[in-house]
Amino acid sequence: MRSLGALLLLLSACLAVSAGPVPTPPDNIQVQENFNISRIYGKWYNLAIGSTCPWLKKIMDRMTVSTLVLGEGATEAEISMTSTRWRKGVCEETSGAYEKTDTDGKFLYHKSKWNITMESYVVHTNYDEYAIFLTKKFSRHHGPTITAKLYGRAPQLRETLLQDFRVVAQGVGIPEDSIFTMADRGECVPGEQEPEPILIPRVRRAVLPQEEEGSGGGQLVTEVTKKEDSCQLGYSAGPCMGMTSRYFYNGTSMACETFQYGGCMGNGNNFVTEKECLQTCRTVAACNLPIVRGPCRAFIQLWAFDAVKGKCVLFPYGGCQGNGNKFYSEKECREYCGVPGDGDEELLRFSN
């Protein structure tokens, strides 16, 4: 996990990038009251980060959950640090030491390569669940910058803690669009190579031209599109910390479900409307699903395929949940489920 140490390495990289002025960090940072250094020792997961360092935005798509282990140092004046994280497809381990100060909860780290000393503060922690660190540094290119990091004893934290972290970060001048959550790719062993992702082929029907308002709502499908490839992925909130309601295709339930999108990055399994999601990702297997109105109380007339009757029928959709057996016109239902005897041409099947 990107540790205090990895954080400091990240901050030092700001020296190599030129950008505009950044907000000035506060002069006086308050540490956790009655800080107990022995209780901060042990393993932590770095789950979120925010920074005024301009370079940070350039690598946000590559930042993943990392681990940090803190412990007693080689001398009474130090604490030891070991961080483990994925970097460029390889599991990397970094070790170092932090210097204690006269203020409990404040530590110094010297980066000899850049000849700078960084100040790190433990500003909030309950020791058993979470910890928030702030780190200040000064570079000749950007002047003073500040970085906030959220750590957890487990790979997941309560949503309220993520919200509290965002408030703390913004309170020291970090812009909202510079606060990110980390993608969790799991823990790794130093030297381990990250496996290549495996895409599972799926089968769906070709669609009618746009003017026919077919299942795809677009041109005749003759090749696999990047968006359709993404239908096999799980949803991704992305590293930013916004809360925008979006839809993703759940291949297990064969339905489009809602999730909270952070506002940046993520992946292609991300749709503004349920209709767009279904018309992009639904497969012919949806025609065999039961007709489900859903628990909400709206009254929306949609079409579904009745497998018993062998035809498309109207049904009142409640407005939420349901499943993929849900079409926005009779023509869409018929062309998708291949209703015989309608004079329609047989629809082609293909796999990606």
From Swiss-Prot:
Highest taxon above the source species: Eukaryota
Positions annotated with a glycan in the UniProt record: 24, 36, 115, 215, 250
Cross-referenced Pfam families: Kunitz_BPTI, Lipocalin
Region (Glycopeptide (secretory piece)): 206-226
Signal peptide start-end: 1-19
Modification note: The precursor is proteolytically processed into separately functioning proteins. N-glycosylated. N-glycan heterogeneity at Asn-115: Hex5HexNAc4 (major), Hex6HexNAc5 (minor) and dHex1Hex6HexNAc5 (minor). N-glycan at Asn-250: Hex5HexNAc4.
InterPro entries, per the entry: A1-microglobln, AMBP, Calycin, Kunitz_BPTI, Kunitz_BPTI_sf, Lipocalin_CS, Lipocln_cytosolic_FA-bd_dom, Prtase_inh_Kunz-CS
Classification via SUPFAM superfamilies: BPTI-like (SSF57362), Lipocalins (SSF50814)
pH dependence: The reductase activity toward cytochrome c increases at alkaline pH 8-9 when compared to pH 6-7.
Site (Inhibitory (P1) (trypsin)): residue numbering on this chain: 297-298
Effect of residue 137 to T: Impairs the reductase activity toward cytochrome c in the presence of NADPH. Impairs the reductase activity toward oxidized collagen
GO biological process, one term: protein catabolic process
UniProt-listed PROSITE patterns: BPTI_KUNITZ_1, BPTI_KUNITZ_2, LIPOCALIN
Keywords recorded for this protein, A-Z: Cell membrane, Chromophore, Cleavage on pair of basic residues, Cytoplasm, Disulfide bond, Endoplasmic reticulum, Extracellular matrix, Glycoprotein, Host-virus interaction, Membrane, Mitochondrion, Mitochondrion inner membrane, Nucleus, Oxidoreductase, Protease inhibitor, Proteoglycan, Repeat, Secreted, Serine protease inhibitor, Signal
Enzyme Commission number(s) of this protein: 1.6.2.-
Site feature (Cleavage) residues: 199
Entry keyword Secreted: yes
Molecular function as annotated in GO: calcium channel inhibitor activity; calcium oxalate binding; carbohydrate binding; heme binding; IgA binding; oxidoreductase activity; protein homodimerization activity; serine-type endopeptidase inhibitor activity
Site for Inhibitory (P1) (chymotrypsin, elastase), residues: 241-242
Family that this chain belongs to: In the N-terminal section; belongs to the calycin superfamily. Lipocalin family.
Remaining remarks: In vitro, the first twelve residues of the amino end of the inhibitor appear to have a reactive site capable of inhibiting the activity of a number of enzymes. Its in vivo function is not known.
Protein name in UniProt: Protein AMBP
